[in-house]
Amino acid sequence: MLDNEQLEQIQKKLQKNITSKRYCHTIGVMHTSISMAMRYGADLQQAALAGLLHDCAKCLDDKEMLRQCDKYDIPCNKTEKKQPYLLHAKLGACYAAQKYGVEEDAVCSAIRYHTTGRPGMSLLEAIVFTADYIEPNRDMDCKPYPLERIRRTAFFDLNQATGMILKNTLTYLEE
């Protein structure tokens, strides 16, 4: 069980390791994750921790990302080796456990899948996946579903919101 002081210590440590812009985004994801956890009945502490640490490995350059994956025996496919920035979620889940002391598998899994999602996502995974996309500091032109529509949908139908995000992501990748 995480208390407020422990969460504050993790925040301070994280703030030293990521850019101020990334930290602002991270705090937005943490608060959005907590709000969604309240709405859907998920564990608030797990939502806070997963939201806070979801991008804890994001600020590494490509070479360092690959080196760290090798160090922690994180498997990388061909696409990830060509585009190492895709590894930040896998490495972030590892960092959450190794560097930030996260013991809950559910939290590490939510971090692991916050970018790609996966079939059969747990409630916490779906919350962090969605919170990363809709947090208040995000400002992006989304197709076919506008960001504001996804934000509204996320608080009354989480499954529909995750589907909308996945559709937007596929549309973006196809363009």
For every predicted segment, state its role.
Residues 12-16, 39-163:
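Divalent metal-dependent catalytic cores for phosphoryl transfer on phosphate-bearing substrates
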Residues 171-175:
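Charged phosphate-binding loop/patch that engages nucleotide di/tri-phosphates or the phosphate backbone
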Residues 2-18:
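Generic N-terminal amphipathic, Lys/Arg-enriched alpha-helix
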Residues 1-5, 157, 165:
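Non-catalytic terminal extensions that flank enzyme cores
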Residues 25:
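N-terminal glycine-rich anion-binding loops that anchor highly charged ligand groups
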